[in-house]
């Protein structure tokens, strides 16, 4: 077991009833339901062999994805050195080193270097992006520098992600993200701009009478038109906003959905 004397670092289970655990720093961005829902929304089949995660943070998403298919090879990219070190701790602890390669780099530099040095392109790219525009956001004094970079477009914008992904993804490769509903129009516009076609869209809604807050989006590079709006995910049954028990449907998604073998 990995030892750490930092009081801000805690060990949490990753999903329900699984053998996966991760260390998280309470002063940094921590995984939540959107991480899990995104990990199980990512399309995986026999043809998907290599995946890039942009902004892995503590590697929760990549570890969950690796558990879905033991043959997957994942490059997990993280710009923040502090988060990168925690990600390494988590990959080591969950024994995923044979599947996950951690890369401490800025995505804007990474994709430019990759097209110079490697002909290999990714079958799939996944990202839980820093989605708040920095100029339009009133910043809380409680927000640490690490959390600001993880949640706001300080180092990386939505357009950076989509533009760079187009350079290093296979034709008809999958780009999958979770974003706030407010950014959906921006997302569709940018996807089309860089030759991606939205294919699957799924809204995440806290309760049945609430507005959607997040949306899962899958797009494919240089693919034909045609988008499918899938049934919504409702997180909680109760209208009482003080009750936060997940619905059974959501609990089932808290376990890695393994790739079906032929």
Q: Could you say what each language-model-derived stretch is?
A:
Residues 38, 128, 161, 219:
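Residue-level signal for inorganic ion chemistry
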Residues 129-160:
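Mobile active-site "lid"/loop adjacent to the S-adenosyl-L-methionine
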Residues 211-262:
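SAM/dcSAM-binding transferase cores
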């Amino acid at each position: 077991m990995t030892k750490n004397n930092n009081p801000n670092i805690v060990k949490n289970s990753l999903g329900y009833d699984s053998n996966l655990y991760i260390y998280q720093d309470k002063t940094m961005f921590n995984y939540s339901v959107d991480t899990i829902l995104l990990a199980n929304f990512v399309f995986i089949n026999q043809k998907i062999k290599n995946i890039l995660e942009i902004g892995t943070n503590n590697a929760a998403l990549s570890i969950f994805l690796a558990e879905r298919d033991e043959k997957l090879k994942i490059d997990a990219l993280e710009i923040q050195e502090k988060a990168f070190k925690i990600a390494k701790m988590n990959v080591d602890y969950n024994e995923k080193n044979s599947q996950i390669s951690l890369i401490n780099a800025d995505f804007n530099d990474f994709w430019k270097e990759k097209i110079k040095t490697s002909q290999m392109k990714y079958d799939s790219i996944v990202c839980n992006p820093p989605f708040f525009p920095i100029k339009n956001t009133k910043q809380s004094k409680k927000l640490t520098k690490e959390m600001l970079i993880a949640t706001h477009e300080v180092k990386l914008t939505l357009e950076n992600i989509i533009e760079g992904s187009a350079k290093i993804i296979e034709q008809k490769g999958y780009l999958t993200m979770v974003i706030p509903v407010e950014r959906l129009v921006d997302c569709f516009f940018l996807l089309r701009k860089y030759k991606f076609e939205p294919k699957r869209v799924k809204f995440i809604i806290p309760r049945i009478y609430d507005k959607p807050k997040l949306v899962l989006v899958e797009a494919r590079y240089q693919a034909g038109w045609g988008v499918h709006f899938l049934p919504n995910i409702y997180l909680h049954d109760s209208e009482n906003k003080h009750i936060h028990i997940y619905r059974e449907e959501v609990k089932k998604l808290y376990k890695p959905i393994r790739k079906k073998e032929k």
